[in-house]
Design a protein with these regions (language model features):
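The conserved Walker
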Residues: 46-47
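C-terminal lobe/lid and adjacent interdomain/linker elements of RecA-like ASCE P-loop ATPase modules
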Residues: 163-181, 188-238
């Protein structure tokens, strides 16, 4: 039984202008529906493959601020989100999330600033700007993780050391076990290792499920670790 908050999305491409760049993204060609059956869903693929665009569209269509934060964040520093949010319909489950957060590495500074502005006596600021980038990013993620919450993370590994990525992995796994749902765009072979997750790959002209060992993040990392000198000799030959 699927008991996720967001159980799938359907696409209505007639709502997108034929000249839109969205219709030139190969992974989107022909896709009509995606199902989300697991508490953790990853989007992986090469840069520009559409994974962050889809994550953003799901977030905006579900009521989150395009730049990140909770549904209560209404600030805007730069209106850059795509029109894909107008072309998707979210299939919701019978449960409703108790909390939610959209976390983007690229707009983290703005979200952290907004958090300070929203702070009051009952909800004091965590003062993220007084911490290192990695410490503040992890703290913001951890401070907002709750059971039965909905979370959309765009490349959370960008600010985190491998050890901190493992810390985040543990937090995500435990929270998912307690009824939370996650959508995560990542290149991290560490985060992708979370057990019992679905991985949607956006490469090779389609959006399709794949296994952990089939992801480029895993394959390239494994190849480099196991054949470092041979690869460097080939790549750096003059």
């Amino acid at each position: 039984m699927n008991n996720q908050f967001i159980q799938g999305v359907t696409f209505d491409w007639d709502r997108i202008d034929n000249n839109s760049y969205l219709k030139r993204i190969e992974a989107f060609l022909g896709v009509e529906k995606l199902d989300f059956n697991k508490p953790v869903t990853f989007f992986v693929g090469e840069n520009g493959s559409g994974k962050s665009t889809l994550l953003e569209a799901i977030a905006v269509a579900h009521g989150f601020n395009p730049e990140g934060g909770t549904k209560n964040y209404v600030f805007s520093t730069h209106d850059t989100h795509s029109e894909l949010c107008d072309a998707i319909r979210i299939s919701k489950g019978y449960r409703k999330e108790k909390w939610g957060y959209f976390l983007r590495a690229e707009s983290f500074y703005n979200v952290a600033t907004q958090e300070e502005e929203y702070a009051d006596f009952a909800h004091p600021s965590a003062k993220y700007h007084e911490k290192s980038h990695g410490e503040s990013f992890l703290a913001l993620a951890q401070n907002n993780l709750q059971p039965n919450g909905l979370y959309l993370f765009d490349e959370p590994e960008a600010a985190l050391s491998p050890q901190r990525q493992l810390t985040l992995l543990i937090q995500i796994y435990r929270c998912a076990k307690e009824g939370a749902q996650f959508f995560i765009v990542t290149h991290s072979p560490i985060l992708l290792g979370i057990p019992d997750a679905d991985i949607y790959c956006f490469d090779n002209g389609s959006i399709h499920l794949c296994e952990y060992e089939e992801t480029e993040s895993y394959q390239v990392t494994e190849m480099f670790i196991n054949n470092r000198q041979m690869l460097l000799d080939k790549l750096l030959i003059e």
